[in-house]
């Protein structure tokens, strides 16, 4: 809502009348609201208050540039139903309405020419040609075989190239290859022989490597692997010839193979122009064979003589036929064929309209010189062939060709080949007019000229078609131009009528500005403004949005103190929104042009003071807030009024507020708008048009990823002798054959005998296989070795023990006896009685031998009684040496006399 300058009721009634008549010119007014109503009457909408400050920032002076730039606005913004308050325009910003302008008639015309068009695009597809790959595949395998299965300990693979002489004499000459290879590694020449047999000539046979673009031939499909005992090394030499496709992209400085290898040499290399062709190889690695005949190893047929290039890499040799760049490569490719094309001439360009394809290409009027195109020799050839085919099929009997093929370079990098066509009737007029001008008779048989040269340039001077002065032709041309002019004039009249209507509307606006300038300027700007007339110009100021919660409506429209007078519009109290600072608030009201404008400064101060003090006003039309309460009238009986407040209406009866009425309860009349139903364009179905297909985009580049991966997968399978590997079953096949023989010859008995033989053989083979597998296991061999070492050590210890027992049996069997004897000898030395000690020792030994003999007999009896209680002689001897007694509970006899006897213990007095 805005606060606008006050006007008399009569003037406002006239303004409303004009607004209703010219509602389209007065699309909006100062105020908008999105408010509700409740109680008496503090109306507010918290949802709308959030945007109050944002809208308030637009308040200020309006320059003339803003008025011009706001000519195109969004009309939906006028009816947002928000409340605005506007400062009184003081003349700081003035605008004027434009004057009616002169309307020009549309007289532009175009020249259209029909014909056949062929469009070309850049050729992004690589150059594809056939190449042959020669190499020898060397495989060296080292195996180890012990008592079990054989093991591969090392496998070395490499490829070496094949010399030109061998290729010419053997491969392409005889269709065979020698299984010997000589190669240089680190300045050392090595030789390899297949199966370690000196070079043998073998025929080249097809391999598993087969694809639509690749074929391969080799001499062997078995990789040699020896399985004799110990370490063995075997060598395989396979001679391989592969036919594949090579690819190269512009500018054709290198090419790639299906193997993934690239060669840094131009595919158009020739020795005659080798300095102008890219080549990274030394001279001895590139050889040009003149009149070379290559052999197809599949059909065994020699090709016609052709110059052929050979490049010798370390791992392979590549050969391909020499090609002419101008006839083989082309930088352009045909895109579209347009049998019905129209060339429309404009001031600076040609528009080539392809209706069937729903496409138009724009090109310069200057024809393109096709000779400027590098490697563009294919363009005229393809264009002539295509246009000739279309003309012979569709236009041969109805049209003739006018001139030759013209080339135009269109925007976007498209090359257009255009052939102009003229109908036979129009061509006759051309020829008749040319004949009259040259005073020569031309018979009607000239109509057959298109079948020969296909052109109407058959006049004596050769330029007859360029003079178009025939009256008959002019009539025909006028008919065509009339139709074209009628269509163009129809559009021109609409434009002229629109211009005249705008001029007349300007006149109405000049009158409306005298009645209600604020409504007029609001409609023009597209947002709420305040305006007043200053002579022949308008003073304009922007408006401040008032939040709905800052507006308080009063429920009575009677003037206090005078019961006979009432307010014409509802009265209210409002407050300006709080500003961020005083300067920002001053910018929201009409600012004076200079500091000497005291009135403007006072107004800014008043506006700043009104931020915090309520301002008395009245609710104006279209959510306007009028400063003051001066709109009064004598009170009338049966008073009933609806006033727009925000988006809804307030109902007053007898100058008292009754209720709030929703806008949906009041019927809206929209018949003030007159719809114009005009079909501007005909229905058009667009045709999908792609410059490059998916296959073309996928095929871009020197290497084809799918082809390289497929080749590598097939290559890995080519030498793995899958089809020739022998599967051994450890002799079961032979035994099975014997069983079948017995069954077939002896019948049922033979079958039983065969089953017995097969069962026994299977058991034997399983046992032998188990033992062989156990011996072949490295852990089993390690365990056997450890067991042998332990047995040897145990044998040495046993041998030493036996030798010791033989030398000193008593000391070996009874080591404790020696200690007792030594102690006894010490006592005997003290007593000086060695003889007695020796005698006693001998008695003890004899007694021990007797006890040992008895114990041996007892042990034998117990072994017979309980076979499970077994013990070795060593265990018995150990127990005897540790305990000096038997391990049985029944035998409680002492082995020897204990040391408690007085013979072995003496008093101190004996020492």
UniProtKB/Swiss-Prot annotation:
Q: Per the record, GO CC terms?
A: host cell endosome membrane; host cell Golgi membrane; host cell plasma membrane; membrane; viral envelope; virion membrane
- Any signal peptide, and if so, which residues? 1-30
Annotated region (Disordered), positions in chain: 591-610
Q: Where is this region: Involved in fusion and/or binding to host membrane?
A: 143-149, 228-233
Compositional bias of type Low complexity: which residue ranges?
599-610
Q: What is its main location?
A: virion
UniProt subcellular location: Virion membrane; Host cell membrane; Host endosome membrane; Host Golgi apparatus membrane
Tell me the Gene Ontology biological-process terms attached to this UniProt entry: symbiont entry into host cell; virion attachment to host cell
User: According to Swiss-Prot or TrEMBL, what is its membrane topology?
Assistant: Single-pass type I membrane protein
Q: Self-association or partners: how does it assemble?
A: Homotrimer; disulfide-linked. Binds to heparan sulfate proteoglycans. Interacts with gH/gL heterodimer.
**This protein is called what?**
Envelope glycoprotein B
The species this protein belongs to is Psittacid herpesvirus 1 (isolate Amazon parrot/-/97-0001/1997) (PsHV-1)
Q: Which gene encodes it?
A: gB
